[in-house]
Design a protein with these regions (language model features):
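Short beta-strand His + acidic residue motifs that chelate non-heme Fe in jelly-roll/DSBH
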Residues: 48-49, 57, 206, 212-216, ...
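Short, conserved beta-strand element in jelly-roll/cupin
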Residues: 39-43, 50, 82-94, 197, ...
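Transition-metal
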Residues: 1-160, 236-254, 278-280
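A short hydrophobic beta-strand segment most commonly corresponding to one strand
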Residues: 46, 87-94, 217-236, 276, ...
Length: 348
């Protein structure tokens, strides 16, 4: 946050007067700003992750504190006692893994290196299948994956695989994560999960227990204020398999993509939790819009130029963001065409 003299962090500003910057309602309910807002530029595939629900986070945080595991330890799962549901909106062509595919049985038939998992899937469903995949000895992971990679890697390097194919991402994962001579077991998950392609302006919500991974593209991500991540592959970092299995939702997922466009005047992204809300706006040059701020809010401009008038006035252009406190009334006038997002706390 820029002000008079040296800059300070938003968290430090909030801590200096929570009643002022959060409002009494949010302060009493959450004790802090209940959300985090990020822009991601995914050039290399990110790890497969699952986030715990609120109760699991509280119990896990308490347990790891009792075990005196340092918050910075690589084997620490719970950095806080909060859940971490997420809403993401694509800013470019965006690819991700999202939940277990309803067509897993077809994938087990279609790919030879997966045939050996058919029996466990038929007997124990998704949970049994995924547990077996995650608990395989590394030598068995390498033995199963290696022959398939030998076939698809030349196709990937010759640009003959479409991004809609799990083979494309499996081959890319080899380049990104398998430099130690072993294959990352997350490669199996690429064939078990939904592969989604969101267009700019489209969004999707990912709740507790939903396995997911961002593969490529730029997006906005709004999430609950937490650092709790249970990793599940495509990473050199710590993977706690028992904790992962205890927090994963083993259900087939039909993706609920929120239709949208970055050229729509107002675009709502419904979030089924009370921690945050997200709305996108496209203001044409000369257009004005009023905002009544009832909760701690972050306004994020992607581009353009806007004259803002409220308790203070500012002319912001390009990529810019600012924090607004409850009770403010803002008037925005676009000097040129501008895309902006408003993150807030609903129901205030």
């Amino acid at each position: 946050v820029l002000g008079q003299g040296a800059s300070t962090s938003l968290q430090a500003l909030i801590n200096s007067d929570k009643a002022r910057y959060l409002g009494k309602s949010v302060m009493d309910q959450f004790g802090n700003l209940p959300y985090l807002l990020k822009i991601l530029d995914v050039k290399d595939m990110l790890s497969i992750q699952v986030h715990p629900n609120k109760r699991a986070a509280e119990e896990g945080f308490k347990k790891e504190n009792a075990l005196a595991i340092p918050l910075t330890a690589p084997n620490r799962n719970y950095k806080d006692d909060n859940h971490k549901p997420e809403m993401m909106v694509a800013l470019s062509d965006f690819w991700l893994l999202h939940g277990f595919s309803p067509a897993i049985d077809q994938h087990l038939d279609a790919y030879g290196f997966l045939h050996g998992f058919k029996a466990i899937f038929q007997a124990e469903g998704i949970k049994g299948l995924y547990q077996q995949v995650m608990e395989l000895p590394q030598e068995e992971v390498d033995r199963l994956i290696a022959p398939h990679i030998e076939v698809i890697l030349p196709l990937y390097e010759a640009h003959q695989l479409p991004k809609s194919s799990p083979d494309f991402w499996a081959a890319r994962a080899v380049h990104n994560f398998c430099g130690d001579g072993h294959f990352d077991r997350g490669i199996f998950s690429i064939y078990l999960f939904n592969i989604l392609n969101l267009k700019p302006g489209e969004g999707i919500f990912q709740g507790a227990g939903m396995p997911h991974a961002y593969l490529e593209g730029q997006n906005i991500e709004l999430m609950s204020n937490s650092d709790n991540v249970l990793r599940a592959g495509l990473t050199p970092k710590h993977v706690d398999i028992p904790e992962l299995l205890a927090n994963t939702a083993f259900v087939p997922t039909i993706a609920k993509i929120i239709p949208g466009s970055l050229n729509k005047t107002v675009q709502l992204y419904p979030c089924p939790i009370g921690d945050f809300s997200l709305t996108a706006y496209f203001l044409k040059a000369g257009e004005k819009m009023e905002f009544t701020v009832t909760s701690p809010s972050i306004f994020l401009m992607l581009n353009g130029e806007v004259q803002w008038k409220g308790n203070a006035s500012a002319d912001l252009e390009g990529a810019a963001a600012f924090f607004s406190t409850p009770g403010e009334k803002l008037l925005a006038e676009a000097i040129v065409d501008t895309n902006l997002f408003w993150a807030a706390v609903p129901g205030q």
